[in-house]
Amino acid sequence: MSIRAEEISALIKQQIENYESEIQVSDVGTVIQIGDGIARAHGLDNVMSGELVEFSNGVMGMALNLEENNVGIVILGPYTGIKEGDEVRRTGRIMEVPVGEALIGRVVNPLGQPVDGLGPIETTETRPIESPAPGVMDRKSVHEPLQTGIKAIDALVPIGRGQRELIIGDRQTGKTSIAIDTIINQKDQNMICIYVAIGQKESTVRTVVETLRKHGALDYTIVVTASASQPAPLLFLAPYAGVTMGEYFMYKGQHVLVVYDDLSKQAAAYRELSLLLRRPPGREAYPGDIFYLHSRLLERAAKLSDAKGGGSLTALPFVETQAGDISAYIPTNVISITDGQIFLQSDLFFSGVRPAINAGLSVSRVGGAAQIKAMKKVSGTLRLDLAAYRELEAFAQFGSDLDKATQAKLARGARTVEVLKQDLHAPIPVEKQVAIIYALTHGFLDDIPVEDIRRFEKEFFLWLDQNGQHLLEHIRTTKELPNEEDFNKAIEAFKKTFVVSQ
């Protein structure tokens, strides 16, 4: 067999023509110091702020401090396997999380990885966790109500879709319960809910997940958890991961509710990272950009304009106070960023007023525009009644003789407090809330003993379900009060059947 030189040279030519040389350039640095979840690396000259880097053992890190001759990296995972002299390489990617419908009903960590043991999450899309908030022209003023199902909130401090309402109070005053009840009440309301647990106990998160599952709320909820046992960087990233997952739905024209439970723990985690990165401390040892940490997160809550699809993202951030001190650093920061706050007081909680909302210190700066007309009409005098009652209550303690008007105010106030009490995980539809508050503000409860008010309410709702459906339907569909004469007749008819306890 003869070797044909032309054929061989043609083949070699073809191979040379088809040869593509691809040189992969990757920035590689060396770990020069490691400890407390922070690594310092030398040689990553072109790394971006917030870029993901990969250590030789596969653990990821995030470049936060870009200094003259080294880079400060926070490690997103166990750091015990990393040692001085190890290689660390750039990925060229900014921190991203998976987003999409597949996350609904799942419990994930701040990196979007499932922690509920239900197998992998099939998502095809990711979004960077740091993204700019919608601009002025992309927004619309808040005008649609977000019904929490809690009488004290829907009547006194209403929340609108796209609002940021701070829930503030000491530990164990029922902050998480308010959020869970609000999520449960979003059933059939076309809302996606995201519950972000920051630095909570694993057992607490488990209880929340089971409560949501029991009430069928997990079908439209994503739970993001960075528990107390996880590294500080994950606690710092958790709220951003939650809002990023929510933005995916908001930009598709859907409505989202994000609960951050709680931002004081995120601030503490960020303080820890900053001090370990040797950034200069400020007031209460927090770094100088602690305000920006929360403002850039909460500014991403918005009601989008119709041109942008009309979606909304409502934020319910929590802040834990120490001994009711709302003038501390983090509480005042977050109060100034949000559109109002709901202040929960431990004194009220322990005296049996639950939800323990202090009506005097709680406000909603934009929610009034979102309240339905019927509720606005009936709850107009409620806040003043409560404020007057709290003021007079102190005088009444002295037991001196009080005139008729003062006695009437005290009696109305005591009944108002009773009406605003509510059981746990029992949200009430807005039309029923309007009915009982109408009865209260129009004097129908003035002759009912205070201890019977809760029973009156329960039986009144049952009676309305059977005999007053047309009234409830009218409020539900028109958002207006029904004919006053018909409403009064219905309440009088029920009062005739109600038996006062002896």
Curated annotation (Swiss-Prot):
Q: Where is this site: Required for activity?
A: S362
Top-level taxon of origin: Bacteria
Report if keyword Nucleotide-binding is assigned. yes
A single GO molecular function, which one? ATP binding
> How does this protein assemble?
F-type ATPases have 2 components, CF(1) - the catalytic core - and CF(0) - the membrane proton channel. CF(1) has five subunits: alpha(3), beta(3), gamma(1), delta(1), epsilon(1). CF(0) has three main subunits: a(1), b(2) and c(9-12). The alpha and beta chains form an alternating ring which encloses part of the gamma chain. CF(1) is attached to CF(0) by a central stalk formed by the gamma and epsilon chains, while a peripheral stalk is formed by the delta and b chains.
Q: Which residue spans traverse the membrane?
A: none
Q: Where does ATP bind?
A: G169, D170, R171, Q172, T173, G174, K175, T176
Q: Where is it mostly found?
A: membrane
What's the name of the protein? ATP synthase subunit alpha
The UniProt entry, under SUPFAM superfamilies, shows: C-terminal domain of alpha and beta subunits of F1 ATP synthase, N-terminal domain of alpha and beta subunits of F1 ATP synthase, P-loop containing nucleoside triphosphate hydrolases
State the function annotated in the UniProt record. Answer: Produces ATP from ADP in the presence of a proton gradient across the membrane. The alpha chain is a regulatory subunit.
**Keywords from the UniProt entry:** ATP synthesis, ATP-binding, Cell membrane, CF(1), Hydrogen ion transport, Ion transport, Membrane, Nucleotide-binding, Translocase, Transport
Q: Which reaction does it catalyse?
A: ATP + H2O + 4 H(+)(in) = ADP + phosphate + 5 H(+)(out)
Organism, scientific name? Geobacillus sp. (strain WCH70)
Compartment(s): Cell membrane
Keyword Cell membrane assigned: yes
